[in-house]
């Protein structure tokens, strides 16, 4: 493991210890109080967020009799805005967007008060091109038609950061397209764009479907982890996409970043407890929806940097005695 990797794990371990020590027991929580409504902001159909959100909503309808819906969105940035406005109750959000939201930095105009219920799986940034494309590295995108993800998505924010780290201005040096995953995959298949960015779990269903229609490659991006960490903190890590994921020619290094299940910080403790409990009770259903859900676990779940674990969620983890 690299020095950066060891350093990152040490920070993660200290964060877990900090949560365990600092968050006090909630003797008055009184157990779960399931809400009557659970609107879950997720992302594009064809992405992992959407698959997991659909399974969680179905579990809430079945177990609670709640009015629960999987809300299709542009993903992380829009999810935070919907959550802050009270239009949804819970959201799946990538950690770098959470950091920007709580700090009130672009694309947010002011700090947003959030808390986390659980850390979920990791996203992998996937820069997809056709197998016969001349694009071999990020800088080969100059002048080409590239989808950087839906507007107001975590994909767009991170794609822009990676492009800037590579010396490319996404507004000047690319023919930028802002497409959802389904639109972008279809455009690449038809030759209407030259590449697409998407940040998601593995395999991303929409990319797997595209790979079944034509040979594709992923462009290596791992070299940009260091400048991203230098510019934006320790949220990013080096990850590899196995060749078997999409029948790729070889394993590809890329940028990884965690995902969190988040709520407004003022959510009632008993409601936060109930939603966290539902997440783990319904985990078999989530795994059936997408295998990345098997990565959800109590040990890593409390490591919700860069935002605090909600006290109600902390109480759930204590009650299950695996904290």
What is the predicted function of each stretch?
Residues 35, 65, 75-78, 85, ...:
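Extracytoplasmic
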Residues 88-122, 132, 201-204:
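Acidic, polar ligand-binding/catalytic clefts
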Residues 35-68, 122-190, 299, 303, ...:
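Bilobed "Venus flytrap"/periplasmic-binding protein-like clamshell domains
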Residues 2-16:
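Bacterial N-terminal signal peptides that target proteins for export
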Residues 252-323:
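Segments of small-molecule ligand-sensing domains
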Residues 30-32:
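Bacterial signal peptide processing site
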Residues 25-28:
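C-terminal motif of bacterial Sec signal peptides marking the signal peptidase cleavage site
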Residues 95-97, 105-106, 133, 170-262, ...:
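Pocket-lining segment of extracytoplasmic ligand-binding domains
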